[in-house]
From Swiss-Prot:
Domain annotation N-acetyltransferase: ranges: 5-162, 155-306
Protein name per its UniProtKB record: Mycothiol acetyltransferase
Naturally occurring in which organism (per UniProt): Saccharomonospora viridis (strain ATCC 15386 / DSM 43017 / JCM 3036 / CCUG 5913 / NBRC 12207 / NCIMB 9602 / P101) (Thermoactinomyces viridis)
Name of the gene: mshD
Domain of life (superkingdom): Bacteria
UniProt keywords, alphabetically: Acyltransferase, Repeat, Transferase
Subunit details: Monomer.
Sample GO molecular function, one term: protein-N-terminal-alanine acetyltransferase activity
Length: 306
């Protein structure tokens, strides 16, 4: 017997149950990035949560989970993530989860991480269209030259200072990513919360200042711990966010910032560097390919009614 429970928030016991499911999925799929303790990953924060149980009473087991972000992306579209426990797949739970989410969602977007054929078949069955691709690109730091960055005249690089630079970074972010469904919503509060994460490293957060001392760009790097089922089981660096103020674009600042971060990650001993880029951002993809990056994964977002 299958039962669904919707919740606006998860109590401690439910968080533990969901974490166990996510960790099991990570062991099989390499995703999502979830820690054995602490808060759930950001993509599962906020309302609403859907828990799918198999069995009754004390014997009921959590076999599936969905997070429905009813707050929506920057364009008012609700976004869902669906995960079925690896030990309970191919039993109709994924279909049932999707049906339940669709009954409660409006203008829905659903992520499929890894562009799995089963997800494509399920999307076709429910009339969902392939609306967005997010490419995961990777490069070997040992095989690339990555020369010293050449900055535009009057621009200098320095690293982020916590408690001082938040407003300046968010101002650039807002202008650089006004088109982006997620990054455009990143604010000072979120940046301060990120600084409490174990992976945050101000020494890997590069800022570009112009001659007047105004921040006109940034490159925020990130280091992921080893994941046995992803990227060869080794720690990897990430070109997390590169943002350039539109007024400072066109002079090579974006490439210079990217190179500064890449060289920093290599100096930290990371043999592999990854990044995420929109599949339709041809200019950025071309730049990354020249820097030695190749596409290794594709995430797909399916859309309801478009």
């Amino acid at each position: 017997m299958r039962n669904f429970v919707w919740a606006e928030e998860l109590d401690a016991d439910r968080i533990d149950d969901v974490r166990a499911l996510l960790l099991a999925a990570r062991e099989t799929d390499g995703r999502p990035e979830v820690e054995p303790d602490g808060p759930l990953p950001g993509e599962f924060s906020g309302p609403r949560h859907l828990l799918c149980f198999s069995g009754e009473g004390a014997a009921a087991e959590l076999v599936g989970y969905a997070h429905l972000d009813v707050r929506g992306d920057a364009f008012g579209r609700q976004v869902a993530e669906l995960i079925v426990h690896p030990a309970h797949r191919r039993r109709g739970h994924g279909t049932a989860l999707l049906e339940e989410v669709l009954r409660h969602a409006d203008r829905l977007r659903i992520w499929s991480h890894g562009d799995h054929p089963a997800a494509a078949r399920l999307a076709e069955r429910f009339g969902l269209s392939r609306a967005r691709e997010l490419l995961v690109m990777s490069a070997s730091s040992a095989e690339q030259e990555w020369p010293k960055p050449r900055l535009p005249e009057g621009v200098r690089l320095r690293t982020f200072v916590p408690g001082q630079d938040e407003e300046a970074v968010i101002a650039v972010n807002a202008r650089a990513f006004d088109w982006h469904p997620e990054q455009s919503q990143f604010d000072v509060k979120a940046l301060r919360e990120a600084q409490r994460e174990s992976w945050f490293d101000a020494d890997g957060f590069f800022l570009a200042e112009n001659a007047e001392g105004r921040v006109v760009g940034f490159h925020w790097t990130k280091v992921h711990p080893a994941n046995p089922n992803r990227f060869g089981g080794r720690p990897v660096g990430e070109v997390y966010v590169v943002g350039v103020d539109p007024d400072a674009q066109g002079g090579g600042l974006g490439k210079a910032l990217t190179l500064a971060g890449l060289r920093h990650l290599r100096q930290r001993g990371l043999e592999q560097v990854i990044l995420y880029v929109e599949g339709d951002n041809a200019p950025a993809i071309a730049v990354y390919r020249k820097l030695g990056f190749e596409t290794v994964e594709t995430d797909v977002q399916y859309a309801q009614g478009s």
